[in-house]
Amino acid sequence: MRRLTRGLTPREIEMASLLFGGAIEYERVRIHARRYMPFQPKNCCMTPNGSMYFHRSCFLPDYTAGDPPTIHWFMHEMAHVWQHQLGYPVKLRGAIRIGLPYHYELRDGATLADYNMEAQGDLLADYFALKFMHKPRVMRQRRYAHSLDLYERVLAGFLADPAAAANLPRGLARRLVRA
């Protein structure tokens, strides 16, 4: 059985650029139609090294053509690409603490860096769904469906400079970025 691997499509790059701007080297991103780990569930994507590994049943030729939940999922995975490319140890962080919570609490005074690796993925994908897709029903944290202003306050530093490593999750893993 042939393994499919591809780069991002022009439409995927255009979509991801709405959120990440020039902070990602899009030509480096690979999408694989295979599991990264043998135990990876079918409905799971792993993005440990700047490339996405979807089970063959979830692999699409262009994720912009997917339904809104699939686009949300793709943008969550693009957040891990962004983290990896900025130097965050996504693979190490995922291995050390399997099961990081995806849940997040938006609050004034918080920044994107206050959230863990997985929560950042959902927070950014939820913001994308609200701001650009106008589809609050696909958000993981639907209670923030009317909180675009709060998202933009929390994301102010990221929106001003998505390429800044200061946006990465705080803690030991981020300190490794500076080492």
Give a label for each model feature.
Residues 32-38, 52, 58-60, 79, ...:
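Short, solvent-exposed loop/turn segments at secondary-structure junctions
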Residues 22, 42-44, 53-75, 111-115:
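Short pre-active-site segment immediately N-terminal to the catalytic Zn-binding motif
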Residues 1-43, 58:
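Hydrophobic or amphipathic, alpha-helical segments that drive membrane association/targeting
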Residues 6-19, 23-24, 47-49, 85-179:
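Metalloprotease/metallohydrolase-associated module, dominated by Zn2+-dependent proteases
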